[in-house]
Amino acid sequence: MRKYLAISVYLLGSIFMILTGMKIQAQKIHLHNKGYDVEYNALTAIADRVEYYLSPSDFQGHRKAKRKAFKVDRRTPAPRAKTSHYTNTGYQRGHLCPAADRSQDKTLYEETFLLSNVAPMSPALNLGAWKSTEDYTRHLSQVYRRVRVVVLVWHTESIAHRLPDSPIVIPYAFGKQVFTADTDSLLQEWFIYN
């Protein structure tokens, strides 16, 4: 089932990109973290895809963790994303795997602040619709006990739209899919322009 779903998502994504003139670039690097996996794109200096599992125990019953500073992910090739690349750009560092979803463990929480797990998001998106997807995903994990979350990042064929003086491409849109962990059935799907 998962294989066919992955193929259909890939085909739908390809059709969408053909119709809209969008293309996901190559040069991908797989980064495995304890709490999530990243498909990092060296040409855009951001992730193309992040995947993780979420259970209520991942975010419930734990005191709010102290916010950490974002860190350069040394596993990524140069030129790397740096925190200074976001300064005074009008974009925020939007988590792809939310820090709040990993608050049960200090190490898991801290690894969400690697710059390979963030992408430029408009403040309206990051604090509005994207936060709503995070909240609803937590709700689904409570209903289904455990869910699989896939976050997708789209950018236009032209990678000229970058943060000033940086290698970081500004995404065109973000997608999120939430599946049941046991049967891999699609529960919810979002596509949100940046």
Report residues per predicted region.
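Positively charged n-region of N-terminal signal peptides that target proteins for export
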Residues: 1-4
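Boundary of Sec targeting at the N-terminus
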Residues: 22-27
